[in-house]
Amino acid sequence: MNQTPGSTVPETATPVTSPASSPSAPETTFTPVIITGMSGAGLSTAARVLEDLGWFVTHNLPPQMILPLVEMCAREDSPVDKVAVVCDVRSREFRGGLRETITELEEKNLAPTVLFLDARDDELIRRFDNVRRTHPLQGSQTLQVGIERERQMLSDLKEEADVVIDTSELSVHDLRRAIESSFRTIAKRVQHVTIESFGFKHGSPRDADFIIDARFLPNPFWVPELRPFRGVDKPVSDYVLSQKGAGEFLDNFIAMLDDMLPGYRHEGKNFITVGIGCTGGHHRSVAVSEELARRLGERPDLDVSVVHRDINRN
């Protein structure tokens, strides 16, 4: 993903409802969004996508100015009904100030959805090198030092974020699709399930809540007439899903999700990522992901999307 390091992009957003700070606090469906994360992880892309979806987006607002902005936008007579704030380490008041602002918003029944964008160190270094820019925290030190400083500064915020997106393996188009799907989910007030197929040889998704290994199924790669196809093609899909254990696996996994999703919803976790892997990410994981998405997509309380990360990778 060729993204300017200082920019920012969001990941799937979770509708968060927090209790009123007092019995007289007004109920509201207004949910502000705070976009933050590692420099170079795609914050600007996220901001542009939200703007295209009708959000009012402000960039690099000091944390102490977020509360007045959100309160103004939350008023009944405000022309703005969706507001997102991009906040990164370039703000002098970032350290500690953002966490304090989030607490203040929660106390006023304006709990924000916090989106955190991340990427591997090696990928961040590559992106900075591509645009020949320095990291905002590196000073006279190396780029790696700047990234390490920022990662340490943001560790608590990442842990508490409602949504974390790892953009290391995402193209700009992949990230746009993920963001569009996630933010449309906010209005629906449903749980969003992203099913991501991948190849273990290329590494597992870092942002997955579940990692499922589909390598227990026979590999269509070794069937000459199926090798040129992919898991989205009917011959491969029929072959994979007809294997012993495939149907039982899907039934059991969905039953497990049925037990867990209500608990996730109660805890305010409305974005779940399921990673399904096989060797290369071309056949078994793709076919199983498509079938799982088809079954879950029939449910009105779920918004389901599918990403085939490695399907076109050699």
Curated annotation (Swiss-Prot):
Region (Disordered): 1-29
SUPFAM superfamilies, per database record: P-loop containing nucleoside triphosphate hydrolases
Binding site for ATP: G37, M38, S39, G40, A41, G42, L43, S44
Top-rank lineage group of the source organism: Bacteria
Keyword terms of this UniProt record: ATP-binding, GTP-binding, Nucleotide-binding
Similarity annotation: Belongs to the RapZ-like family.
Name of the featured protein: Nucleotide-binding protein CE1710
Species assigned in the record: Corynebacterium efficiens (strain DSM 44549 / YS-314 / AJ 12310 / JCM 11189 / NBRC 100395)
